[in-house]
Every structure is written in structure tokens, then in C-alpha cells.
Amino acid sequence: MDLDIVTLARIQFAMTTIFHYFFVPFSIGTGFIVAIMETMYVIKKDDLYLKMTKFWANIFLLSFAVGVVTGLIQEFQFGMNWSDYSRFVGDIFGAPLAVEALLAFFLESTFIGLWLFTWDKVSPKLHVTFIWLVCFGTLMSAFWILVANSFMQHPVGYTINNGRAEMTDFVALFTSPQVFYEFTHVIAGAIIMGGIAIAGMAAIQLLRTK
């Protein structure tokens, strides 16, 4: 195989994407499981659920942090590795990514900070609300990123003008059937992955303690 600059760029981008995407579904899935655990604690007042929540929260936060860092690297590589593509579709591709960064990511970051630093400082009901808002933020984040990805798979709402793609219908971007297919697939897969990962690690720990 001839390792020219394009092939090397593809290999680098593929490695970054694969590494990044391991943490994305894992953090989405574990986030929902942690939220369910804390909800059970609030409802049943059983300290076992609180211990479970705090234990898995550490793993969720680590996965979330690594996912954010690798995601930033991936976004930089769009400009560094595929600058021609970025110039061609930047007006369209950048819009959902900007919404994701300015709205969804800030929502996640704000409430994950409130959730992390307000144990025993706010009421349990308010505290569990924070983690559910984090989960809502991850859904929004995934949605807008998948809007950008769905345009790559099935371009809609654009026209070619002077050799560049220009947006003609912003609503068409996030109402495309492709977005629905990708979003349901990714979120369902993430929740399943999170549940299986937690169940698997818990099963290993139970076997070790026998």
C-alpha cells in the first residue's frame, strides 16, 4: 500500500475516530445508568443505591472527560486533514457543530459541575435533577453531531454556489429521515453498551469476591 499523504491522513483520522467513539456511547450509556441509580436512591432511600451511584459516577466522569478531549482533537483534524472539504461544506457542516458546542456542550458541562460539587449541599431531588439534565445534554450533543453526520451521508437543504456548498434550508438538516435513523441507532446502542459494560464489570467483581 502506497502511504501517500491522503492515506496517512485517513489512517490518522480513522484512529482518532475509533478511539473517540469508544468513549462516546460508553459515557452516554453509563450516564443514564448512573441517573437511574441515583433516582432509585431518591425514591427508596437505600444507601446501597447511593454507593452504586458514587462508584459508577467516577467511571462515567473519566469516560466523559476523555471523550471531550478526543472529540476536540477530531474537530481539529477536520481542518488540518480535510481542509478542502471543510471549506466546501463549512457553511453547512459548521452550523450543527456550533449549536452542539454553544448549547448542548455548555449544558452538559454546567450541570455536570453542579452535580459533581453539590453532594450533600442541595436536596437529593434537586441533585438527581442535575444528572438527568446532564443526560439530556448528552442527547442534545449527540443529536446535533449526528445532524452534521447525516448531512455527510444524505445531503439536504443546500445548493452549490461558486464551487461551495451553501445552506438553503436549516430546518431540512435536522428533519431529514437520516437523522432519525442515526439518532435512534446511536442512542439505543449507547444505552445497551453502558448497561452491558456495567453489568459485565459488576459480574467480574462478584466472581472475584466469591
What is the role of each PLM region?
Residues 1-210:
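Polytopic transmembrane helical bundles with strong interfacial aromatic enrichment
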